[in-house]
């Protein structure tokens, strides 16, 4: 008697459902980033409360249209305070947006319909209104640090309504 072949699971191929952040290969780790670039916005911390405030000011290396770093391989050398996410940091950083795939996976949640690993299309993150495309006013080199408070916005910490849908709108 031969064993029946294992029925493929709907989870097969969805590495983020079967692995912890620590188990991801470097390629899987990088592919988990949805390309929203919200983490590339300048943030301010209230010294008294520790609360983090987002601005619509991008890092000096952020290409706001592409929602990508202009020098990703050398970003830490060129921007010393650039945060290189690790599984530990994903679990500890309170400012990661609610849509962050690293945070979702760390919390045992699934990715949204617009994530490129689900949709197969890197543009759905923009279509869903999750990315910073069209919302970055300037870069940090154009705004004096003293004026960053004038550029505080709330949208990076929120999830747009159409991004919360269970599937891509028609």
UniProtKB/Swiss-Prot annotation:
Which Pfam families does this UniProt record tie to the protein?
Answer: CxxCxxCC
Q: Which InterPro entries match?
A: Puta_zinc/iron-chelating_dom (IPR005358), UCP006173 (IPR008228)
Q: Which HAMAP family match?
A: UPF0260
Family, according to the entry, reads as follows:
Belongs to the UPF0260 family.
What's the protein here called? UPF0260 protein Rpal_2074
| The organism's taxonomic lineage, starting at the top | Bacteria, Pseudomonadati, Pseudomonadota, Alphaproteobacteria, Hyphomicrobiales
């Amino acid at each position: 008697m031969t064993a029946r072949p294992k029925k493929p699971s709907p989870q097969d191929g969805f590495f983020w459902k079967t692995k912890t952040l620590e188990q991801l290969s470097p390629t899987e780790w990088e592919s988990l980033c949805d390309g929203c670039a919200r983490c590339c916005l300048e943030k301010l911390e209230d010294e008294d409360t520790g609360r983090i405030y987002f601005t619509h000011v991008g890092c000096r290396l952020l290409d706001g249209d592409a929602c990508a770093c202009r020098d990703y391989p050398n970003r830490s050398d060129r921007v010393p305070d650039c945060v290189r996410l690790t599984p530990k940091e994903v679990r500890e950083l309170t400012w990661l947006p609610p849509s962050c795939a690293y945070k979702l996976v760390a919390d045992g949640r699934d990715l949204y319909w617009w994530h490129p690993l689900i949709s197969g299309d890197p543009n759905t993150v923009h279509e869903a209104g999750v990315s910073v495309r069209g919302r970055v006013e300037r870069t940090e080199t154009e705004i004096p640090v003293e004026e960053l408070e004038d550029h505080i916005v709330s949208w990076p910490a929120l999830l747009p309504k159409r991004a919360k849908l269970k599937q891509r709108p028609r």
